[in-house]
């Protein structure tokens, strides 16, 4: 971030600060944070990056890690949840700004940056979220007053700042929600801002041992790059072999993750009842060679969607560390032997389960981000040779 990037911030002007005042304070404080905190994922230094990006609805930083691994530098982040902010700070050395719907928060966004990244809240559009809201008589999709309109704040930021590109993520059901009308509105809104729009549903199971289909949307500024520009999803490098869940399972796991007799009996009875009715609801056990079901934010409640069998014992939940690895985050000693480059979990188990259940498959976002980075460098006439990765293990 530089002084020129914050000249437009009205909140700073209201406080009597100049852009240079803010820039000097920001740089000094940020360097102190990096030096004192010794965070595992600080990202490239200013001036050494290939592109800049902002991280909206940042969660625990799945987009940030992925884009930093492609030599991008984050110049703004926003996340409303205080527990996710804590995890974000522990790993990246920055506390994200809060509610992105507030003008004061938006005023801190640099005037210029290259890519807008955002995995905007999926509950209004997910199958599980919609089903629950319907059963409770609540609105869903764009009619959800709390979360359904958050996309339009993204559109507003794109319209005001005109980044070179956007990179968005949401649930698979976004494409079919409300008979396709929701997706149509998103597409037409972004195209109406003179951006290209390409989207694809991709399963994270090619990168991690988890079935997790998500909708990815990428677009370029057509005013800058012309009408023919578009994102090349076919250039994404997909691993030759899918990983299995045995690669992320720990041994000698704390007994607290083993299901109680009462909970295990309840899950078995619940599954039996629904099986007799012809429904598919129930718990999901895994084998070392298998791929798990989709990890959800409700995993902390009973762990039923992903249970690990144990000889002579009730099955157990995944540990938070295993959940981190299941989403592709490097965490010692499961998928990295570098203690200094291991994801930090500074919150309770329940909060960690929610955070990883809400997160993205980081290596998949990294793979898409690599193509996006290369296209931007090519469009801007810069060298597209890949630099050494800062890197997370895939």
For each of these PLM feature ranges, what is it?
Residues 18-162, 172-176, 181:
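Core alpha/beta nucleotide-donor-binding catalytic domains of modification enzymes
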Residues 100, 125, 174, 208, ...:
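Short clusters of hydrophobic/aromatic residues that line enzyme substrate/ligand-binding pockets
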Residues 59, 88, 116-119, 154, ...:
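Conserved small-residue
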Residues 106-113, 127-294, 298-300:
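Class I S-adenosyl-L-methionine
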């Amino acid at each position: 971030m530089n002084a020129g990037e914050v000249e437009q911030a009205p909140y700073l002007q209201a406080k009597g600060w100049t852009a240079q005042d803010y820039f000097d304070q920001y740089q000094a404080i940020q360097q102190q944070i990096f030096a004192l905190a010794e965070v595992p994922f600080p990202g490239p230094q200013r001036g050494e990056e290939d592109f800049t990006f902002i991280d909206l609805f940042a969660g625990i930083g799945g987009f940030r890690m992925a884009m930093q691994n492609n030599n991008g530098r984050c110049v703004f982040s926003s996340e409303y949840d205080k527990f996710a902010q804590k995890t974000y700070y522990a790993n990246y050395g920055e506390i994200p700004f809060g509610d992105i719907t507030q003008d004061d928060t938006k005023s801190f966004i640099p005037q210029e940056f290259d890519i807008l990244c955002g995995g905007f809240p999926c509950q209004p559009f997910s199958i599980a979220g919609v089903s629950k809201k319907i059963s409770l008589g609540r609105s869903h999709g764009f009619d959800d007053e709390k979360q359904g309109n958050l996309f339009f704040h993204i559109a507003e930021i794109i319209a005001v700042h005109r980044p070179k590109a956007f990179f968005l993520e949401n649930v698979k059901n976004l494409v079919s929600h409300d008979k396709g009308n929701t997706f149509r509105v998103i597409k037409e809104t972004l195209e109406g801002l003179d951006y290209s729009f390409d989207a694809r549903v991709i399963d994270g199971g090619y990168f991690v041992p988890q079935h997790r289909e998500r909708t990815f949307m990428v677009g370029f500024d057509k005013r800058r790059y012309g009408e023919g520009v578009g994102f090349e999803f076919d250039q994404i490098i997909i691993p030759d072999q899918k990983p299995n869940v045995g690669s992320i399972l720990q041994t000698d796991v704390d007994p607290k993750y083993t299901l109680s007799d009462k909970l295990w009996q309840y899950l078995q009875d619940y599954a039996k009842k629904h099986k007799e009715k012809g429904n598919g609801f129930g718990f999901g056990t895994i084998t070392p060679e298998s791929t798990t079901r989709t990890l959800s934010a409700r995993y902390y409640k009973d762990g039923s969607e992903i249970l690990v069998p144990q000889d002579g014992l009730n099955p157990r939940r995944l540990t938070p560390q295993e959940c981190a690895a299941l989403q592709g985050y490097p965490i010692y000693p499961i998928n990295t032997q570098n203690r200094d480059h291991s994801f930090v979990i500074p919150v309770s188990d329940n909060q960690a389960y929610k955070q990883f259940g809400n997160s993205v498959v980081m290596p998949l976002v990294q793979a898409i981000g690599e193509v996006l980075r290369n296209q931007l460098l090519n469009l801007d006439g810069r060298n597209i040779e890949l630099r050494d990765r800062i890197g997370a293990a895939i």
